[in-house]
Amino acid sequence: MPRPSHRLLLSAVVAALALTVALVAGQASARSNAQITVYAAASLTDVFPRIDPGQKYQFGGSNTLAAQITLGAPADVFASANMTLPNQLNARGLCSKPVVFTRNTLVVVVPKANPKNVRSVYDLTKPGVKLVVAGPGVPVGSYTLQILKNMNLTSSVTKNVVSQETDVREVLAKVALGEADAGFVYSTDAKTVADKVNVIKVPAWAQPKVQYGICVVTRSNNKTDAAAFIAKVLSKAGQARMLSYGFLPRVKPAPAKKQ
């Protein structure tokens, strides 16, 4: 039986190597387009899927999501309604250094019928007003307490709190359904049920600094794709989408210079 020539052997080796390279490249390509899991604040429920509809999203109270990530939940990206929680995760080595990706403001919402005739934040001190807020561990709950402190209304308003919810959407739902007379929510959330609630503005001087932070979760097996998602959120198109949903620019514009 004739032996195969060196040329044939070399050709076979080259073909095998080419096949291996193709398979590896295919696997790498698949990884670069992997679907990631984004844990995001409830207030981002409507906008994030519009920025990138191809990802898997878990929305909820930022504090709850942070606790789940701490316990090993399979998140690739964490987007919080404050900077405190992602900074805490970063300090523990559980996520990358967070960056601010948007800002927001708070408002008071009341049912369209407004049975208690609430017209300002000060009206929340009226006897019998049923106020619903988010819990103090939830970013919007912490911001609410800051507003009341800034307005020197903490004790006179908190006595009317009848329920503390786990995220901003739960607060909004109770007011929209008429189960409460008023609630503190983000201005962006109020717009989602404009046909069911009226909005009462919080004075600008009483507004807290509401910044949203985003980071890559350390345990993620898709860090490249997670970073690409964050880049998409920070991109010109991503920021334009955030603005279209009522969020504020990630960097507060400098005040105009006096002429």
Model-assigned labels for residue ranges:
Residues 11-22:
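Bacterial N-terminal signal peptides
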Residues 3, 23-52, 56-58, 63-74, ...:
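Exported/periplasmic ABC-transporter solute-binding proteins
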Residues 10-11, 61:
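Hydrophobic alpha-helical segments, principally membrane-spanning helices and signal/leader peptides
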Residues 2-10:
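Twin-arginine (Tat) signal peptide motif
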